[in-house]
């Protein structure tokens, strides 16, 4: 029996790396409560790279990061798209 293991980290980097140098928008990067409602901000900039992090100590979860205009953003639970 042949088992194909889904390598999520490879899929992420293979999808993102060809887009380095292009514009990317990350939705709802910052969420703040102003007392009445949540304020959300999107970030648009030039993609400089991507990283993944696997938490081997606790639950083995994987986090995904994009470097945009010199800042690194956690996009694990964020939508992003290339413009």
Q: Which residues does each predicted region cover?
A:
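Basic/aromatic-rich interaction segments and small domains that mediate binding to polyanionic partners
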Residues: 8, 29-77
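Short hydrophobic/aromatic patches at helix-to-coil boundaries
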Residues: 79-83
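Mixed-charge, Lys/Arg-rich low-complexity intrinsically disordered regions
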Residues: 1-33
């Amino acid at each position: 029996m042949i088992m194909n293991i889904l390598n999520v980290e490879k899929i992420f980097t293979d999808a993102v790396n060809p887009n380095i140098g292009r514009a990317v928008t990350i939705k709802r990067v910052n969420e703040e409560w102003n007392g009445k409602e949540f304020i959300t901000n999107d970030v648009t900039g030039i993609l400089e790279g991507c990283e993944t992090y696997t938490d081997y100590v606790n639950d083995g979860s994987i986090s995904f990061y994009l470097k945009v205009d010199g800042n690194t953003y956690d996009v694990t639970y964020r939508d992003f798209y290339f413009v």
